[in-house]
Amino acid sequence: MAGKSSLFKIILLGDGGVGKSSLMNRYVTNKFDSQLFHTIGVEFLNKDLEVDGHFVTMQIWDTAGQERFRSLRTPFYRGSDCCLLTFSVDDSQSFQNLSNWKKEFIYYADVKEPESFPFVILGNKTDIKERQVSTEEAQAWCKDNGDYPYFETSAKDSTNVAAAFEEAVRRILATEDRSEHLIQTDTVNLHRKPKPNSSCC
């Protein structure tokens, strides 16, 4: 795959105000704007990178977290290769809503095998001192819901932002490798010469 670029669609989901737009902008442009408005509908940015020898274009989709925008965002779930479920560590309700976001994504993205779909969990706004969700709580949720990787991030100071998105790519590549292996084990070699018949007439 080296030398050839793949396009991966990665979608950020979570309550409004948890910092999804800021995470996307920090990762793609390395900028932080505290005055960002809530996303209406969806928007996306592209980022080219190399992960473990694989050249990848990440198409990162940011979605509106408010309930009233559900009909605008859900049509864009289809075709996603990875979902970054995002909450804010200073907002316990956004953490409690992770399960609802996961269910919404699986339904509208029409995920055929939810158990193997690559989710990555982000606990954002770690720069805020007054936490409502502990690291241990978040790690326990990840373990109980699919053994998902968990990153505590800050779009403001860029903590773990690049690491989280790169892990998303690794998860996608691992999923693709598994499916390619399954396909290869079921194929028949049409170019293999038949063994000569050793029986005599």
Swiss-Prot record:
It comes from the Eukaryota. Its main location: membrane. GO terms for molecular function: G protein activity; GDP binding; GTP binding; GTPase activity; identical protein binding. The modification N-acetylalanine is found at residue 2. Regulated by guanine nucleotide exchange factors (GEFs) which promote the exchange of bound GDP for free GTP. Regulated by GTPase activating proteins (GAPs) which increase the GTP hydrolysis activity. Inhibited by GDP dissociation inhibitors (GDIs). It is found in: Cell membrane; Endoplasmic reticulum membrane; Golgi apparatus membrane; Late endosome. This is Ras-related protein Rab-9A. Pfam families: Ras. Gene3D superfamilies: P-loop containing nucleotide triphosphate hydrolases. Its cofactor is Mg(2+). One of its GO terms (biological process) is positive regulation of exocytosis. PROSITE patterns: RAB. A motif (Switch 2) lies at residues 64-78. It is a lipid-anchor. Belongs to the small GTPase superfamily. Rab family. It is an enzyme of class 3 (hydrolase). The modification Phosphothreonine is found at residue 187. A lipid is attached at residues 200-201 (S-geranylgeranyl cysteine). The modification Phosphoserine is found at residues 34, 179. The keyword Lipoprotein applies. GTP binds at residues 17-22, 33-34, 38-39, 65, 124-125, 127, 155-156. Its EC number is 3.6.5.2. Interacts (preferentially in its GTP-bound form) with GCC2 (via its GRIP domain). Interacts (GTP-bound form) with SGSM1; the GDP-bound form has much lower affinity for SGSM1. Interacts with SGSM2. The GTP-bound form but not the GDP-bound form interacts with HPS4. The GTP-bound form but not the GDP-bound form interacts with BLOC-3 complex (heterodimer of HPS1 and HPS4) but does not interact with HPS1 alone. Interacts (GTP-bound form) with NDE1; two RAB9A-GTP molecules lie on the opposite sides of the NDE1 homodimer; the interaction leads to RAB9A-dynein motor tethering. Mg(2+) binds at residues 21, 39, 62. It comes from Mus musculus.
